[in-house]
């Protein structure tokens, strides 16, 4: 199994380290042809408007959407979650628009208000998950076909719809690989 990690900006190397800790190979994806031999794709954090511009410049939107419609599992973290959302509150920025969610950008404040906390995610076991929130979005609303996996202060921060998984936080910035393992189980 080989997982692609979109490598235009953000913590893509940290995602690759998490995948390696799970015993899985990964490649950095910057061009459409690199999507051909992967079994899943992680879209990392970063700045979502910049990411959208870069994805457009590198002609990645259509190939990712096509692969996703054909069943390619996607995992979006922070800005990656924004890119997967069908709706972004108050924004018309470019996005993949694959997941039936509406997100609010920078919902937990500015960079200086970034924080870490522990989340209970029953799908990942009893031990809490350390979650790093950096200028994080949250999910304002979900369609009936979206499963909410975790909330923080009553705000949805982790959700799954079919072969799409999104997190408002950065699991790759901790040593806990359970969320990456959950994504990998979606592929097998």
From Swiss-Prot:
<comment type="subunit">
    <text>In the presence of PdxS, forms a dodecamer of heterodimers. Only shows activity in the heterodimer.</text>
</comment>
<dbReference type="GO" id="GO:0008614">
    <property type="term" value="P:pyridoxine metabolic process"/>
</dbReference>
<protein>
    <recommendedName>
        <fullName>Pyridoxal 5'-phosphate synthase subunit PdxT</fullName>
        <ecNumber>4.3.3.6</ecNumber>
        <ecNumber>3.5.1.2</ecNumber>
    </recommendedName>
</protein>
<comment type="function">
    <text>Catalyzes the hydrolysis of glutamine to glutamate and ammonia as part of the biosynthesis of pyridoxal 5'-phosphate. The resulting ammonia molecule is channeled to the active site of PdxS.</text>
</comment>
<dbReference type="InterPro" id="IPR029062">
    <property type="entry name" value="Class_I_gatase-like"/>
</dbReference>
<dbReference type="GO" id="GO:0006543">
    <property type="term" value="P:glutamine catabolic process"/>
</dbReference>
<keyword id="KW-0315">Glutamine amidotransferase</keyword>
<comment type="pathway">
    <text>Cofactor biosynthesis; pyridoxal 5'-phosphate biosynthesis.</text>
</comment>
<dbReference type="GO" id="GO:0005829">
    <property type="term" value="C:cytosol"/>
</dbReference>
<dbReference type="GO" id="GO:0036381">
    <property type="term" value="F:pyridoxal 5'-phosphate synthase (glutamine hydrolysing) activity"/>
</dbReference>
<feature type="binding site">
    <location>
        <position position="105"/>
    </location>
    <ligand>
        <name>L-glutamine</name>
    </ligand>
</feature>
<dbReference type="GO" id="GO:0042823">
    <property type="term" value="P:pyridoxal phosphate biosynthetic process"/>
</dbReference>
<comment type="similarity">
    <text>Belongs to the glutaminase PdxT/SNO family.</text>
</comment>
<feature type="active site" description="Charge relay system">
    <location>
        <position position="172"/>
    </location>
</feature>
<feature type="active site" description="Charge relay system">
    <location>
        <position position="170"/>
    </location>
</feature>
<dbReference type="GO" id="GO:0004359">
    <property type="term" value="F:glutaminase activity"/>
</dbReference>
<feature type="active site" description="Nucleophile">
    <location>
        <position position="78"/>
    </location>
</feature>
<dbReference type="InterPro" id="IPR021196">
    <property type="entry name" value="PdxT/SNO_CS"/>
</dbReference>
<keyword id="KW-0663">Pyridoxal phosphate</keyword>
<feature type="binding site">
    <location>
        <begin position="46"/>
        <end position="48"/>
    </location>
    <ligand>
        <name>L-glutamine</name>
    </ligand>
</feature>
<keyword id="KW-0378">Hydrolase</keyword>
<dbReference type="GO" id="GO:1903600">
    <property type="term" value="C:glutaminase complex"/>
</dbReference>
<feature type="binding site">
    <location>
        <begin position="134"/>
        <end position="135"/>
    </location>
    <ligand>
        <name>L-glutamine</name>
    </ligand>
</feature>
<keyword id="KW-0456">Lyase</keyword>
<dbReference type="Pfam" id="PF01174">
    <property type="entry name" value="SNO"/>
</dbReference>
<dbReference type="InterPro" id="IPR002161">
    <property type="entry name" value="PdxT/SNO"/>
</dbReference>
